[in-house]
Amino acid sequence: MLELKGKYGKDCKVFIDNVEEAALSTIYSILDDEVSANVPVRIMPDTHEGVDIVIGFTMPISDRVNPNHIGVDIGCGVTCGRIPKMSMSLAEIDERIRAAIPMGFAHRSSLHPFASENSAMEALATKIGQDPQNVYRQLGTLGGGNHFIEIGEADGDWYIFIHTGSRNFGLQVCKYHAAKAKANGSKYLFGNDM
């Protein structure tokens, strides 16, 4: 584990011993910004360079936020759950998952059923200049990169692991708010703009 200090950020822990230079430089740039003063900064072991921030970065915020620190993959995370054993093999389950869930750049040909229940998402998509229908066709799909669905067995039980993401929608939300901050002459949003 590394413990780092910058001009303002004095309580930073990186939960790995070796960090690539570009990521380390980005971490120090945040520790040298007053946004990191008097708050704990924690960096997860899978850290690597992102946009204005490293992946795996966590820090409480109060009076300001940099949209790029929230990131372009809003909702990204990993979840795990135990599932009932099925009569089919893991290979058959994998085949069914691949048939049912669009992956990579693919999306649904019809709207996800959630579309009829969520006017808030439609309003947000419209606000940031995105076609809500396109957003709804991406719901319940699996992006590319390091996103995955995995079924495994441990101690006689079956588990499903899913690394989720927001697809292009998260990128567009971030771009909208970053442009708003830039229009205000800052990289941060303050108060009601957050």
Task: Name the predicted role of every residue range.
Residues 1-41, 47, 57, 61-69, ...:
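Glycine-rich, flexible loop motifs
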Residues 50:
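Positively charged, aromatic-enriched nucleic acid-contacting surfaces
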